[in-house]
Curated annotation (Swiss-Prot):
Spermidine binds at residues 139-140, 262, 309, 335-337, 344-350. This is Deoxyhypusine synthase. NCBIfam families: dhys. NAD(+) binds at residues 108-112, 134-136, 140, 257, 304, 329-330, 363-364. One of its GO terms (molecular function) is deoxyhypusine synthase activity. The keyword Acyltransferase does not apply. The lineage of its organism: Eukaryota, Fungi, Dikarya, Ascomycota, Saccharomycotina. The active site is at 350 (nucleophile). The keyword Transcription regulation does not apply. Pathway: Protein modification; eIF5A hypusination. One of its GO terms (cellular component) is cytoplasm. Keywords: Hypusine biosynthesis, NAD, Transferase. Belongs to the deoxyhypusine synthase family.
Amino acid sequence: MSNIDGKLPDILSDAVLKQSVPVPDNFVKVEGIDYSKPESRNMRSKDLIKSMATMGFQASSLGKACDIIDEMRSWRGEHRDKLEEHDRKGSFDNDGYQKTTIFMGYTSNLISSGLRETLRFLVQNKMVDAIVATAGGVEEDIIKCLADTYLGEFSLPGKGLRDQGMNRIGNLLVPNDNYCKFEEWIVPILDKMLEEQENYVESQGKDCLDSNFDQDSPVWTPSKLIRRLGKEINDESSVLYWAYKNDIPIFCPAVTDGSIGDMLFFHTFKASPKQLRLDIVSDIRKINSMSMEASRAGMIILGGGLIKHHIANACLMRNGADYAVYINTGQEFDGSDAGARPDEAVSWGKIKADAKSVKVYADATVVFPLVVAATFASE
């Protein structure tokens, strides 16, 4: 291609040197942390996350997650005294003003990990209003009160571990003896719960099983079972203990999908023909009612699957959550619930169209301690 006039051919100029439109005033400049500046050293967690928010990629999503959590926690509505009687439900702060009802969900592996202590901090300090966990998220909390979990390697061969009676959760190791200790601990409690159930039905009649929402009655639900376990463990390192102390319900719609399910199964043989009964219908009414009564609803979801959808579906009952923060590594391309972005939940009415929402694509054990340090624990 000849060039006798010293100019670029128009095709090159148009393709490579295309002019940009003026940059809008509200565009945010990409900047990172300059550690050569004194103010960038020994930063507080909140300042670190604020600085990361302009980095781009998941650092910016992390910053947005913290902003949303700060907003869901700081929102206040009307004072209780200004509300009609039927509106005096939901969550209120210590001064009597409406606040966001925060639903937190987490998967069992996060309790197996060292994130348990972070989650316990939130429950101990009444920073969430309801929890949805998988069965492992219940039993692993109790088991850690009875025996330790250890660091291992992702690459440890399963056959050798099985021969040694060691169970692997990622790069964590749980001796099988821990589950034996769990069985020894829980079976007498199940025996007592069955006895209380049978005595109650005998004294009240079978009608007592119908629509029984008495928190203290031995007409058991998964959340009542978990509350009882928190009471019985009586250990301040336990999430369940603090949930019991602070009257924070822990819902577990798949309570049989784990070691607890094994224990309940074994118990049917021991107690036969009597059986301990768990009413899941009362629990779905309870969590859905909490959502319907909330002045505003916020979701903090760590992981995916059942715990994510159970909270989102509860928020459908109020035409969607007002705030949503997802932290997981799931991708949406297989159509999984875990991988779905918040906008998919908007299409179902589970998150409001004008809600503040974000998904952080990251391992929750890396990200959530930073989130808590910059939000809940920064006061």
